[in-house]
């Protein structure tokens, strides 16, 4: 785990999600010190935001791809 104040821009969605899941497990166990738990929580928020951003980017790409030949756009609600 790196500094809780920053998040590497090149971290993949899968890596971020895996790390976020690990943080949740650690916090749920309640075996970390308060300071460590707060730092983990802070990192978790950064990871959550990163995952949401990646999902939004993917959704926008998919919407762009669904353009029809006549340049109309078909936007279908996607479940994420």
UniProtKB/Swiss-Prot annotation:
UniProt-listed Enzyme Commission number(s): 3.1.11.6
Catalytic activity as recorded in UniProt: Exonucleolytic cleavage in either 5'- to 3'- or 3'- to 5'-direction to yield nucleoside 5'-phosphates
Location relative to the cell: Cytoplasm
GO function terms (MF aspect): exodeoxyribonuclease VII activity
Gene3D superfamilies the UniProt entry points to: Exonuclease VII, small subunit (1.10.287.1040)
Iron among keywords: no
Quaternary structure annotation from Swiss-Prot or TrEMBL: Heterooligomer composed of large and small subunits.
Protein known as: Exodeoxyribonuclease 7 small subunit
Organism per entry: Rickettsia africae (strain ESF-5)
